[in-house]
Amino acid sequence: MTITCNLYIDGQWHDAEDRRTFTRRHPAQDDVASVAAAASLADGKRCVEAAASAFPQWRDTLPAERRRLLLDAAEHMLLREAKFIAAMAAETGATAH
C-alpha cells in the first residue's frame, strides 16, 4: 500500500509548487511506503499566508466551538487509526502492534 501525501494549504490539497516529491521506502522490504510532496520555500510562504489569514477567525471562535472542532478532528483521526498505524509501520519497518 503506497500512501500519497500532498500539501493541505488554505483548505485545499496541493502538489508542491514545483511538483517535486520524496519517497519513503519500507526499510526491510524496499517497497514504496509513501510519496509526499516536497514543499518548497514558496509552498511554505503560502502556508504562512494562509495561516495568518485564517487566524482572526480562529481567534474569535468561542472556546466551546474550538473544543468541538478539535474533538471532531480527533474523531476523524480515530476512524482512520488502522491506516495511520499501517502507514507508520511501513515507513519505519516496525510492527503494527
Model-derived segments and spans:
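Glycine-rich loop-to-alpha-helix module at the N-terminal edge of alpha/beta enzyme cores
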Residues: 29-97
